[in-house]
C-alpha cells in the first residue's frame, strides 16, 4: 500500500499558439502513468494521440473580459495572462473534490519536457503527506516557482483554498495586491491558511533564487524549460540531472 491516495490527476493549460510553439513537446514526452487534462481559453484540435482540450468556463471568460484592457508593464502585474492557469486548477480541483474522482491534483506548466515517469513511491516520498494541503517550490524571500504545484484533494482545507482563490479572481481582489501574477496570489492564500488555520504544506524548493525546479528532486523527473533562452536551447542548463539538448525535438 503506497498511501491513502489512489488516483492522481495531472493538468496543464495552453492555447493553439503555445501548442505549436512548445507545448507539443509536453504531450510528446508525457510519460507519467496518470490521467492528463488540458485546459484552454478556447477549444482546438490536437492530432497527437487522443488528447482533448477542455474549454475553460464562464468565470474565466468573464474575468478576462473585465480586465483585458488593464495596462501591463511587466508580468508582475499581468493578471489576465496567468489567470487561465488559476481557473484550470480551480475548475478541475473543485470538480474532483465534489465528484470524489481524484485524490491528488498536480499542475505542470506546458513548457515542460518529461524524462522519467513520476511514480506513486516518488509522490509518497517527496510530494504527499496525509496532513499537508499542498506542495510547492519555495524560493526564500521571493514568490514561489509555480510551474509545479500539487494539492491533496482529501485534505480538509483544500476546497476552501480553491474557493478563496476563486474569490480573488471572480471579484478582482488580486488587483488590490502588490503583484497580480499567479505565483504571488497562490503564495498569498497559502500563507493565509498557514497563519489562520495552521495548515501544513510541503516546500520542496531550496529557498534560493533562480531555476529551483531544475535543482529540486523534480529535476530528476522532468525539465521545466522556462524562459526564452532555455526554450531556444531546448533544455535547462541548470539541471544537474540532465544534459540533453532537446532543440531538435519537433
Which residues make up each language-model segment?
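N-terminal anchoring/stem segment of glycosyltransferases
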Residues: 1-73, 80, 95-101, 153-157, ...
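A residue-level signal for conserved active-site and pocket-lining positions in enzyme catalytic cores
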Residues: 10, 89, 149, 186-189
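Well-ordered, non-membrane alpha-helical segments in soluble/globular domains
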Residues: 20-25, 120-121, 184
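A structural signal for well-ordered alpha-helical segments within the folded catalytic domains
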Residues: 24, 83-87, 180-188
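A structural signal for short, well-ordered beta-strand segments and their strand-loop junctions
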Residues: 37-40, 104-109, 114, 134-136, ...
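GT-A fold catalytic core of metal-dependent nucleotide-sugar glycosyltransferases
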Residues: 83-135
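Conserved catalytic core of nucleotide-sugar-dependent glycosyltransferases
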Residues: 115-181
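Catalytic core and acceptor-binding pocket of nucleotide-sugar-dependent glycosyltransferases
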Residues: 155-250
Amino acid at each position: 500500500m503506497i498511501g491513502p491516495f489512489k488516483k492522481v490527476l495531472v493538468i496543464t493549460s495552453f492555447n493553439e499558439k503555445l501548442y505549436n510553439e512548445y507545448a507539443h513537446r509536453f504531450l510528446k514526452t508525457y510519460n507519467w502513468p496518470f490521467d492528463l487534462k488540458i485546459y484552454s481559453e478556447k477549444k482546438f484540435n490536437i492530432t497527437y494521440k487522443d488528447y482533448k482540450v477542455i474549454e475553460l468556463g464562464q468565470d474565466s471568460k468573464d474575468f478576462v473580459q473585465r480586465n483585458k484592457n488593464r495596462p501591463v508593464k511587466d508580468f508582475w502585474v499581468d493578471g489576465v495572462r496567468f489567470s487561465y492557469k488559476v481557473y484550470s486548477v480551480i475548475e478541475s480541483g473543485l470538480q474532483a473534490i465534489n465528484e470524489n474522482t481524484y485524490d491528488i491534483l498536480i499542475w505542470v506548466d506546458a513548457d515542460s519536457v518529461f524524462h522519467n515517469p513520476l511514480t506513486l513511491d516518488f509522490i509518497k516520498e517527496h510530494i504527499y503527506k496525509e496532513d499537508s494541503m499542498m506542495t510547492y517550490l519555495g524560493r526564500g524571500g521571493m514568490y514561489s516557482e509555480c510551474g509545479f504545484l500539487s494539492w491533496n484533494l482529501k485534505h480538509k482545507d483544500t476546497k476552501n483554498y480553491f474557493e478563496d482563490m476563486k474569490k480573488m479572481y471572480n471579484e478582482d481582489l488580486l488587483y488590490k495586491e502588490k503583484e497580480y501574477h499567479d505565483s504571488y496570489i497562490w503564495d498569498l492564500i497559502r500563507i493565509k491558511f498557514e497563519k489562520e488555520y495552521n495548515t501544513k504544506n510541503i516546500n520542496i524548493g531550496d529557498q534560493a533564487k533562480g531555476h529551483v525546479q531544475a535543482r529540486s528532486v523534480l529535476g530528476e523527473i522532468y525539465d521545466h524549460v522556462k524562459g526564452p533562452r532555455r526554450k531556444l536551447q531546448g533544455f535547462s542548463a541548470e539541471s544537474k540531472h540532465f544534459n540533453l539538448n532537446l532543440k531538435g525535438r519537433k
